[in-house]
Amino acid sequence: MITVTDLTKSFPMGGQTLTVLKGVNLQIQRGELIAIVGASGAGKSTLLHIIGTLDRPTTGTVHFDGKDIFHLSEGEQADFRNRRIGFVFQFHHLLPEFTALENACMPALIQRRHPEDIEPEAIALLQEVGLGARLHHKPGELSGGEQQRVAVARALLQKPDLVLADEPTGNLDTHTGEALFAMMRELNKARGTTFVIVTHNDKLSAQADRIVHMQDGQIV
């Protein structure tokens, strides 16, 4: 499904060059749930952002179903990102003035799909993540765990092939974080959606199909 080859990423810093990814190679199979672990600064989030086309590599390639995603135009990348990749971040990034249902619908609305077409899908997803009774609550009326469940529902609305989750439990207490991870594991199995999750939590990463260890910009 995804092949990362000889990936490097460098940034200019104070007249010098900081290299945060150093020749990364990685294969991700369809339907896997992969945990990426490592110390802060190891390059985990940078790798995730490049796979999701939120950033570009300095050198190297990322192939998605055989296609080099960085040969796409910016517009094609944006469409690819919206249709085929879902994102969950440490902070939920929900729009505070909109309800849980409206937030979950947002990726499809960006694609100019009609609300009456997508609301049943969004309601079903929110029910699937345990929020059937919270559809019309705004983010400020939801707990941290509930906010992240809305974010997961939003990530899945377009039926993406891949969900990229960057420390999705980082702002949650232990019990809530474990429940969220268990929910993503269930969705992975039930839907066959590929999940790549960055986490510092060893207990959670142990539940993944595969653990990818990163250190100093490399997979070790």
Specify the residue positions occupied by each region the protein language model found.
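ABC family nucleotide-binding domain
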Residues: I2-M214
